[in-house]
Amino acid sequence: MARVKRGVQARRRHKKILKQAKGYYGARSRVFRVAVQAVTKAGQYAYRDRKVRKRQFRRLWIVRINAAARLNGLSYSRLINGLKKASIDIDRKVLADIAVRDQATFSALAEKAKASLTA
């Protein structure tokens, strides 16, 4: 059987890593050993931050809903509780979008929440 040298595979692997490290500062974009570490760490950060992004958006939606709710004389928790009691099933993403883009509709929802809290 013929001897196989791994030069082609090594070159391909090096090119792949250095391509991923393009735009990094200094040795991180030029030296293979350093680039491997940088690309690996970048992947770890990317994986972690895809999870964090979901949490951050939920926090942003809650802040926006709370601000709009307080303009209508309710706190965030009382608004959400009132909507649940009124059987209005609307998620925080959509509710925050309504609060920002359509205050009249949000006010109507807040009134329904208030009514269901008193009833």
UniProtKB/Swiss-Prot annotation:
Highest rank taxon of the organism: Bacteria
Keywords: Ribonucleoprotein, Ribosomal protein, RNA-binding, rRNA-binding
Entry annotated with the keyword Hydrolase: no
Pfam family, one: Ribosomal_L20
Any one GO cellular component localisation term in the record: ribonucleoprotein complex
GO terms under biological process: ribosomal large subunit assembly; translation
InterPro entries with a match to the protein in the record: Ribosomal_bL20, RIBOSOMAL_L20_CS, Ribosomal_protein_bL20_C
Sample GO molecular function, one term: rRNA binding
Role this protein plays: Binds directly to 23S ribosomal RNA and is necessary for the in vitro assembly process of the 50S ribosomal subunit. It is not involved in the protein synthesizing functions of that subunit.
Family: Belongs to the bacterial ribosomal protein bL20 family.
Protein name, as recorded: Large ribosomal subunit protein bL20
Protein species of origin: Alcanivorax borkumensis (strain ATCC 700651 / DSM 11573 / NCIMB 13689 / SK2)
